[in-house]
Amino acid sequence: MALQMMKLVIEATVNTTVDPANTRFFHVTTTETAAGATLTIDAADFFQDDGTAVTTLPTLETDNSYYNVYVNGVLQMDGVSTYTPGATGVGSLDIDVPAGGDPILANSPVVLEVVNYTPSSTTTVAT
């Protein structure tokens, strides 16, 4: 008999699901924030989609999340803001208004969007 390669016969199927959880938080500024200053918004100063008060800003899942900040409906650049998850007095959003730019005016809407992904995979192996 001639030499032949002996190998395993295996079939595998992997199903991966990624479920996003998108949460939006809203705030309307009460005073002007000058260029070069920082606007700090505490968790309790935000309200949710249904108008209820926020008590806690969610944790960003490591490598499976991001947040966006909109001021007056305009998406802001990365690096302008700092997000800190947590309850009232701990959780906050800091927006550093660039020096030499325009201020954030009073009554400006600020929207914080937090997206966390929950991935899951199942593998079926048949031999």
Tell me the role of every PLM-derived stretch:
Residues 2-71, 75, 114-126:
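Extended beta-strand solenoid/passenger and fiber regions
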Residues 77-85:
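A short acidic/small-residue loop/turn micro-motif
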